[in-house]
Amino acid sequence: MPDPARSWPGAIVDSWLCLPGHPVHRLIAPFAYTFTTRKSFDMALRSIRSVAVFCGSNHGASETFADDARALGRILAEAGMTVIYGGTTNGLMAVVADAALAAGGKVHGVTTETLHLRGQSHPGLTMCEIAPSLQLRKARMIELADAFIALPGGIGTVEELMQVWSMNQLSEIDKPVGLLNSAGFFGAFLQFIDHMVDTKFLPAAHRHSICVEADAASLVDQLRSYTHTDVPKWL
């Protein structure tokens, strides 16, 4: 059953939760559980109960990518943090999920109806939701998570990372963002971000508003100590 501190408009089917717009939801929505949203919490001590992990649906060229993904899943589970991810059985996404589950942690998947119909939904998750579209999938993951970590991945991973980074920049959310720089994967990406700073398209403070570490445990520690700073977007 979902955390009562969360608010969600879906309906549970076994361990699955279908979002509005899904055909099953229209049938059983009248019988759905409802919860109230927690009104406030102490921001002085950042409590991270859940972390959305963005990463590749492939394993990548280096075994280090999978090793670091496995370490992250275990560390999040041992810290009592629920892993929020894309809900599939593919690539680094599955590596993180399986490692967290093996360590006794909770894993909450959010997949799309298209991927679910292709048989790509992970069958062993604590909970998995079916979103009608990719956009709603991302929105739901952002809603569920208290923090975000990006691992090596493709354009989908970069898109998810940039969306939450931009939302923090505009103060639409106050949730820390981290990069697990496995095997130096994000080195060229960070050089490009530095180029944005050098060419006066990005304030330097925003460049340093994300946490970057090559070690999963150190990255999680950084996220816990993160403090949001309001910086004007325009130079």
Where are these regions (language model features)?
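Short, Lys/Arg-enriched N-terminal segments with co-localized hydrophobic residues
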Residues: 26-42
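Active-site/ligand-binding-proximal alpha/beta "capping" segment
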Residues: 136-171, 178, 230-232
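A cross-family phosphate/adenosyl-ligand binding-site feature
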Residues: 39-144, 182-217, 222, 226-235
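Leucine-biased recognition of intrinsically disordered, low-complexity hydrophobic segments
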Residues: 17-19, 27
